[in-house]
């Protein structure tokens, strides 16, 4: 798996992403950002219990959810509401957005928004997460095969060291282009003798950027006392429904402090990127930009003046 410094820029990083489906971006977050963000989310993690939220034990999906969430894993979501560093710095990461535009924007109707964000903390004694594709969230894409454009991509940044022993994400580079419909209908990828995974070993601030088609899963934590903590930020095509219902869960007071682009990532704007001369067709109020309808102020974001 290739490792490229963030300073290499989006072109080099995206080329490796297209080839392997995954790449380690070294120094994606600064040490200062890691420290300040970690401090802001610590109270929420302290209050959180490990494992999946309470559910109907008779539900067919209960066991699957327990395995995916992890019985000794904490998952803290809704980070926009918990961290100013997240909403004003991490969600505004310029390299990240340059890569997202390369992944999702091929024509004037294309765009993207945030699917979900969470801090994932794998405790000692945790079992490995089942190998899966994030694209399983959107079954039509999964069934259509590898030729489909990306539905979802993920950035997982290390907040603590990721090692082979403490639960570094296990990944299978190249599996974004070799799957079949039969494999997609069989969740037991662990039984595939041809599947080779490697641990995404990272220092704090490093990030794995990967396709929703890549097979991966959280590793087992075999240490006695090391918590493996990471930040996952996933993004989807704007025509798809996100996991987190941000327009119904993020307060207007918080949204008013954010940039136009940040608001668009949460669904408080009709589209991102904004392309001059292209009208709004999705997520509108009678064809008008939804943010203007609800009274959000126009702002400048990056090189786009709105």
Swiss-Prot record:
UniProt binding sites for Fe cation: 132, 134, 216
Pathway: Secondary metabolite biosynthesis
Molecular function, one GO term: dioxygenase activity
Cofactor requirement: Fe cation
EC number from the UniProt entry: 1.14.11.-
Superkingdom: Eukaryota
Enzyme class: oxidoreductase
Catalytic activity: (1S,4S)-4-[(4-methoxyphenyl)methyl]-2-methyl-2,5-diazaspiro[bicyclo[3.2.1]octane-6,1'-cyclohexan]-4'-one + 2-oxoglutarate + O2 = (2S)-3-(4-methoxyphenyl)-2-[(3S)-3-(methylamino)-8-oxo-1-azaspiro[4.5]decan-1-yl]propanal + succinate + CO2
The UniProt record lists the keyword Metal-binding: yes
Keyword field: Dioxygenase, Iron, Metal-binding, Oxidoreductase
Physiological role: Dioxygenase; part of the gene cluster that mediates the biosynthesis of the alkaloid (-)-FR901483, a potent immunosuppressant that shows efficacy in animal models and a probable inhibitor of purine nucleotide biosynthesis by targeting phosphoribosylpyrophosphate amidotransferase (PPAT). Within the pathway, FrzG cleaves the C9-N10' bond to yield a conjugated iminium. FrzG is also able to catalyze the dehydrogenation between C7 and C8 which leads to a shunt product. The biosynthesis of (-)-FR901483 starts with the condensation of two L-tyrosines to yield (S,S)-dityrosyl-piperazine.
Quaternary structure, from the entry: Homodimer.
Protein name: Dioxygenase FrzG
Organism: Cladobotryum sp
Gene behind the chain: FrzA
């Amino acid at each position: 798996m290739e490792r490229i410094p963030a300073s290499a820029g989006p072109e080099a990083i995206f080329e490796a992403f297209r080839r392997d489906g995954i790449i380690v971006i070294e120094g994606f977050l600064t040490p200062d950002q890691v420290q300040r963000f970690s401090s802001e989310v610590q109270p929420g993690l302290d209050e959180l219990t490990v494992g999946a939220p309470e559910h109907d034990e008779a539900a067919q999906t209960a066991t699957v959810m327990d395995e995916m969430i992890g019985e000794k894993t904490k998952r803290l979501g809704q980070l926009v509401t918990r961290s100013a560093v997240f909403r004003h710095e991490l969600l505004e990461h310029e390299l990240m957005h340059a890569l997202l535009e390369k992944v999702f924007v091929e024509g004037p109707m294309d765009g993207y928004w945030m699917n979900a964000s969470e801090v994932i903390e794998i405790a000692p004694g945790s079992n490995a997460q089942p190998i899966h594709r994030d694209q399983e969230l959107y079954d039509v894409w999964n069934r259509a095969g590898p030729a489909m454009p990306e539905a979802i991509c993920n950035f997982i940044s290390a907040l603590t060291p990721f090692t082979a022993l403490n639960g570094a994400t296990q990944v299978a580079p190249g599996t974004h282009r070799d799957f079949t419909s039969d494999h997609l209908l069989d969740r037991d990828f662990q039984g595939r003798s041809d599947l080779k995974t490697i641990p995404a070993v990272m220092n704090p601030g490093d990030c794995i950027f990967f396709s929703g088609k890549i097979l991966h899963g959280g590793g087992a934590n075999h240490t006695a006392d090391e918590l493996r903590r990471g930040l996952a930020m996933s993004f989807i095509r704007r025509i798809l429904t996100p996991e987190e219902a941000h327009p119904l869960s993020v307060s207007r007071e918080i949204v008013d402090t954010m940039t136009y682009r940040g608001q668009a990532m949460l669904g408080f704007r009709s589209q991102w990127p904004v392309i001059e001369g292209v009208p709004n067709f999705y997520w509108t109020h009678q064809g008008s930009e939804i943010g203007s309808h609800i009274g959000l102020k126009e702002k400048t974001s990056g090189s786009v003046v709105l």
